């Protein structure tokens, strides 16, 4: 397959789209093609590979072992092609084109506002924003899937990072919570803790705090988003550890309160992260400079 790659770049893009969506129809919609056209291209790729790349299990489309292996190579090639385009743009001093940014879910509360300001100054930029949990973002960094990332706890490698702004983590409760005095984690052992899914940065931090303090919560409820957790806390379902950046409005109008817990807030930081060795186009370099400048004014 690799020796045919220069003649079949579009086929690789189609294969990548189907692998991401695990759906021919959704991939076709993204690419602006018909579903039969996408299916035909996949059949041609399978003929070149000499192995089936997808298998249908009932109504679910899955990658075969061959498909999974090929996908890694295809994404490496597509990333290299993208980097080559950016290198050529850099030589031309181009400050437009596509810019793909990934942010952890907690950062979605402030990242769109910053990106809106940036794109106003760079109207030629086609901006793509991907929101995911920490574990998924780490996978994207490893795969060189996007240009840059914003996250709270960056990997040690293979990435370079720059500190952006403070990200204090606090314990919050509904406004009618009875106890607000100085608390220890043992005082909270009778509470219901609302937590994100495994792989989330806040979930990892909360579990570490519980382990460090030897606390076994009375009850834990898992939820898939910070927004759902905030609504549940305001409804009195329990308490949660969240980034203060995610709830400025709720705190200002008194819907949530910060509990006075010993050892909190935990002072963390936001970082902009770039995969080590990645060539940044001028527009990406401009974005990094903008984010650093914006952080200094926060």
UniProtKB/Swiss-Prot annotation:
Database matches in PANTHER family: HTH-TYPE TRANSCRIPTIONAL ACTIVATOR CMPR, HTH-TYPE TRANSCRIPTIONAL REGULATOR
Coiled-coil regions listed: none
GO molecular function, one term: DNA-binding transcription factor activity
Native source species: Rhodospirillum rubrum
Function summary: Transcriptional activator for the cbb operon for RuBisCO and other Calvin cycle genes.
Database matches in Pfam families: HTH_1 (PF00126), LysR_substrate (PF03466)
DNA-binding region coordinates: 24-43
Similarity remark: Belongs to the LysR transcriptional regulatory family.
Keywords: Activator, DNA-binding, Transcription, Transcription regulation
InterPro entries to which the protein is assigned, alphabetical: LysR_subst-bd, Tscrpt_reg_HTH_LysR, WH-like_DNA-bd_sf, WH_DNA-bd_sf
Keyword Phosphoprotein attached: no
Protein name in UniProt: HTH-type transcriptional regulator CbbR
PROSITE patterns: HTH_LYSR (PS50931)
SUPFAM superfamilies: Periplasmic binding protein-like II, Winged helix' DNA-binding domain
Residue span(s) of domain HTH lysR-type: 7-64
